[in-house]
Amino acid sequence: MISSLHRPTLAKVDLSAISENIEQVVSHIPKQVQTFAVVKANAYGHGAVEVAKHVSKQVDGFCVSNLDEALELRQAGIEQPILILGVVLPDGVPLAIQENISLTVASLEWLALAQKQGLDLTGLTCHIKVDSGMGRIGVRNLKDADNLIAGLKALGADVEGIFTHFATADEADDSKFKRQLSFFTDLVDNLTARPRLVHASNSATSIWHATTVFNTVRLGVVIYGLNPSGSVLELPYNIQPALSLETALIHVKTLPAGQEVGYGATYTTTAEEVIGTLPIGYADGWTRDLQGFHVIVDGQLCPIVGRVSMDQITVRLPKVYPLGTPVTLMGENGGASITATEVAEKRGTINYEVLCLLSDRVPRSYD
């Protein structure tokens, strides 16, 4: 998709904020723990290559979701270890070996398929995924983990790590978290051959359960300045949102009372109202359920009226403003602010999704 460079809609990414967030989290976890920055999904909408280049000296490696995301980093000159957290089928092994990319292996079925294809795994680095209660991917018992490690080594692979993922580390009720932690700890402690890297800590675990980390952590949404729990749990220290979303007024008009606005005529002016139009819509990731939310103009919260269109939204203004007046959709403006968590709560979702949905039509700039 082509970025819309010739309109005022822009996502501004503060790379120094990401660096400071990493420093903040790392200062609260045990020393000598390896840190992997999670830059999957285009670094949660922030720009994977730009983020990885900026923080490369602060972290020990990177985590991505799939082989294409890993290749993007390698082609951009990123040399640190890269771990793919999702499953890459065995036919991706030769490319992973060639580019020195670590794969997650999550089942004996994967091993059987590699054996059937006659693959030589010499030169492949892999991590075993354990399903400790998430229910997605991973082996579910000690026997399978032992057999998988042994089978991979027999084919020449370097089984560098073993890991799991917590489902509820960002919730007030930590009972399921404790069950998962106990399951994983017991499995790792009883392995016949324990890999060098053991990791279970995502952002939430690193924040609220820092004493339970093993020897490696995966830092995701927290480095971008977002609370992993939304507003459920308070952060024990400050982090800075790294992304702001801005645009500008492209049309301003005064409508009389009784005038309908937008698709479906879902909004009708109740008095003479000043309506401004902004060049952003659901094709940019500013979704239709944000009707009734607000933006910031001149330090004032202005409601989104009428339906969100594909390319435009309309807002009610307190007065007539000139064309080109800056508008903030996320971030700070004149003492007022809107956070990704507030946008998420309006939409009934999580702050992760708000940022990940910002499409490639929205250019990113970097400070």
Curated annotation (Swiss-Prot):
A Gene Ontology BP annotation from the UniProt entry: D-alanine biosynthetic process
Cofactor dependency: pyridoxal 5'-phosphate
Its job: Catalyzes the interconversion of L-alanine and D-alanine. May also act on other amino acids.
Keywords: Isomerase, Pyridoxal phosphate
Name this polypeptide is given: Alanine racemase
Pathway participation: Amino-acid biosynthesis; D-alanine biosynthesis; D-alanine from L-alanine: step 1/1
Top-rank taxon, per record: Bacteria
Sequence positions bearing N6-(pyridoxal phosphate)lysine: 40
Keyword Isomerase carried by entry: yes
Gene Ontology cellular component annotations, sorted alphabetically: cytosol
SUPFAM superfamilies hit by this protein: Alanine racemase C-terminal domain-like, PLP-binding barrel
PANTHER family: ALANINE RACEMASE (PTHR30511), ALANINE RACEMASE, CATABOLIC-RELATED (PTHR30511:SF0)
Reactions that this protein is recorded to catalyse: L-alanine = D-alanine
InterPro entries: Ala_racemase (IPR000821), Ala_racemase/Decarboxylase_C (IPR009006), Ala_racemase_C (IPR011079), Ala_racemase_N (IPR001608), Ala_racemase_pyridoxalP-BS (IPR020622), PLP-binding_barrel (IPR029066)
Entries under Pfam families matching the protein: Ala_racemase_C, Ala_racemase_N
Membership in a protein family: Belongs to the alanine racemase family.
Keyword ATP-binding: no
Active site, UniProt feature: 40 (proton acceptor), 263 (proton acceptor)
EC number: 5.1.1.1
Residues where substrate binds: 136, 310
GO MF terms held by the record: alanine racemase activity; pyridoxal phosphate binding
